[in-house]
UniProtKB/Swiss-Prot annotation:
Subunit structure: Monomer.
Disulfide bonds: 41-52, 46-63, 65-74, 82-163, 103-145, 134-158, 168-299, 211-227, 219-288, 313-388, 345-361, 378-406
UniProt source species: Desmodus rotundus (Vampire bat)
Its job: Probably essential to support the feeding habits of this exclusively haematophagous animal. Probable potent thrombolytic agent.
Alphabetical GO biological process terms: plasminogen activation; platelet-derived growth factor receptor signaling pathway; smooth muscle cell migration
Family named by the database record: Belongs to the peptidase S1 family.
Catalyses which reaction(s): Specific cleavage of Arg-|-Val bond in plasminogen to form plasmin
Protein name per the record: Salivary plasminogen activator beta
Stored InterPro entries: EGF-like_dom, Kringle, Kringle-like, Kringle_CS, Kringle_sf, Peptidase_S1_PA, Peptidase_S1_PA_chymotrypsin, Peptidase_S1A
Length: 431
């Protein structure tokens, strides 16, 4: 039985109709005996990975926000220090105009007759609400806000800086020339974010190839948690970047020891839910991987990124050609797959295996005699990337996690949904 002041406070606020956000560690699922029960919300209400709690038989809800996010529905990103493009998606906390004036709260009664205010029905979608942060709800040239000048309300652009042009997700793509079972042989310059993770043998000298990985910044590699079920200490791991051939050294490859191995604390080794891990590369300076044509970080997605169903994406890795193959591929391979609708990414289509909201499905929809070679991930590809083109940059959508066989017709592969873990990634990458 749990009977804490925090729990009682949450219950009282829910019943009183309060809607607010709580830090993750402040919320408890169990209530004292006799209080009203509450559970997950019936519909998506919280952004950026926030968890929604709703009192039974009541419409009121509480958003439990990940670190770095706040607001009624976790819509404010407290870490955003610049805006991209025109700043339509900027959700930071900058509140000063170019003239140095303080912005007016979007919920102010003084703005009631203005077109854009925090009381619109679509205010949350536009980034407006009970705050005075700069926004661009009308697709203007940059973020702006209302300020008071000479007793008048005027629109002024804000002094929030523009983000530097990102180089993540850029590459020199080479059209694959050789076909292989399950995919196409490719060059590392086509997938410069691909990492190869090796582990020391426990009972003999040398090391063995363990899993794929994804470079997401100079010193961090994202991969799958299930790769580390044997609990290797970080000093027994090695990460290689810039390698076309799995065991043959490349001219421009970069090799790193591992400083830290962080496995998601709620990883389920039965269902593979929360199948995500981070490796911190070891370096004597703040810079680890050096950017080149063969080594480059992938772009992480925006939290609200939703690509259309059946969007064509790519996977890469050094895994087996098919499930019956005795060895991993000697050369890096790529596969072309399409994002499945969520309605087709369920246990029903995957032999009753558990599929959670932290997973997404992608597969090769071609079939028949013309396309006998179905592209798919296989053993050894785990931890590698599922990337899609977004805003002219390749962007990470998934981490290769599990599947039923390899290259089976009409059976998609299952990937860890990266957008659900942006807060977790950010928190664990902090010094």
């Amino acid at each position: 039985m749990v009977n804490t002041m925090k729990t009682k406070l949450l219950c009282v606020l829910l019943l009183c109709g309060a809607v607010f956000s709580l830090p993750r560690q402040e919320t408890y699922r169990q209530l004292a005996r006799g209080s009203r029960a509450y559970g997950g919300c019936s519909e998506l209400r919280c952004f950026n990975g926030g968890t929604c709690w709703q009192a039974a038989s009541f419409s009121d809800f509480v958003c439990q926000c990940p670190k770095g996010y706040t607001g009624k529905q976790c819509e404010v990103d407290t870490h955003a220090t610049c805006y991209k493009d025109q700043g339509v998606t900027y959700r930071g906390t900058w509140s000063t105009s170019e003239s140095g004036a303080q912005c007016i709260n979007w919920n102010s009664n003084l703005l009631t007759r203005r077109t854009y205010n925090g009381r619109r029905s679509d205010a949350i979608t536009l980034g407006l609400g009970n705050h005075n942060y700069c926004r661009n709800p009308d697709n203007n040239s940059k973020p702006w806000c209302y300020v008071i000048k000479a007793s008048k309300f005027i629109l002024e652009f804000c002094s929030v800086p523009v983000c530097s042009k990102a180089t993540c997700g850029l590459r020199k793509y080479k059209e694959p020339q050789l076909h292989s079972t399950g995919g196409l042989f490719t060059d590392i310059t086509s997938h410069p974010w691909q990492a190869a993770i090796f582990a020391q043998n426990r009972r003999s000298s040398g090391e063995r190839f363990l899993c794929g990985g994804i470079l997401i910044s100079s010193c961090w590699v994202l991969t799958a948690a299930h790769c580390f079920q044997e609990r290797y200490p970080p000093q027994h791991l090695r990460v290689v970047l810039g390698r076309t051939y799995r065991v043959k050294p490349g001219k421009e490859e970069q090799t790193f020891e591992v400083e830290k191995c962080i496995i998601h604390e709620e990883f389920d080794d039965d269902t593979y839910n929360n199948d995500i891990a981070l490796l911190q590369l070891k370096s004597g300076s703040p810079q680890c991987a050096q950017e080149s044509d063969s080594v480059r970080a992938i772009c992480l997605p925006e939290a609200n990124l939703q690509l259309p169903d059946w969007t064509e994406c790519e996977l890469s890795g050094y895994g087996k050609h098919k499930s019956s193959s005795p060895f991993y591929s000697e050369q890096l391979k790529e596969g072309h797959v399409r994002l499945y609708p969520s309605s087709r990414c369920t246990s029903k289509f995957l032999f009753n295996k558990t599929v959670t909201n932290n997973m997404l499905c992608a597969g090769d929809t071609r079939s028949g005699e013309i396309y006998p070679n179905v592209h798919d991930a296989c053993q050894g590809d785990s931890g590698g990337p599922l990337v899609c083109m977004n805003d002219n940059h390749m962007t990470l959508l998934g981490i290769i996690s599990w599947g039923v066989g390899c290259g089976e017709k009409d059976i998609p592969g299952v990937y860890t949904k990266v957008t659900n873990y942006l807060g977790w990634i950010r928190d664990n990458m902090r010094p």
